């Protein structure tokens, strides 16, 4: 989670990424199933959090075992990245050019990870977002704005 938990009316709420690390598929399902929207009318701009390309900074040994995978959140971040890649591929198949994913490259040395909801992490994510916006090809982006 990139964001700290928040208490509202005595209930504790966590970052929604704990439920849907790539909510694109959930959004499309909700639009189709509950709102009756024809998928041919859907355009989706998906904004990532730089984890789709996650790889452990030091790599992982073939015989690392549970300790190697569980240290530094490697297993969790790998599972998040794989889910995001899977959902992105499905959305590209279903929506084609009507789907655009904006995401930064995972900065291995940037001190980002699970439960690192620090001011430094927020600054890093903001800087990654700014760079992504600067570098995006504006032509396909226009249909989403």
Predicted regions: what is each one?
Residues 1-145:
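Conserved catalytic cores and adjacent C-terminal regulatory segments
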């Amino acid at each position: 989670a990139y964001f700290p938990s928040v208490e509202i009316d005595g209930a504790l709420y966590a970052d929604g990424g704990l439920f849907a690390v790539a909510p694109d598929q959930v959004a499309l399902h909700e639009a189709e199933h509950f709102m009756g929207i024809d998928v041919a009318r859907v355009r989706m701009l998906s904004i990532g959090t730089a984890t789709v390309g996650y790889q452990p900074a030091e790599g992982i040994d073939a015989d690392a075992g549970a300790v190697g995978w569980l240290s530094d959140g490697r297993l969790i971040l790998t599972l998040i990245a794989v889910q995001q890649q899977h959902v992105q591929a499905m959305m590209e198949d279903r929506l084609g050019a009507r789907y655009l994913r904006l995401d930064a490259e995972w900065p291995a040395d940037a001190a980002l990870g699970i439960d690192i909801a620090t001011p430094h992490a927020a600054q890093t994510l903001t800087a990654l977002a700014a760079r992504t916006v600067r570098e995006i090809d504006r032509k396909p982006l226009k249909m989403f704005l």
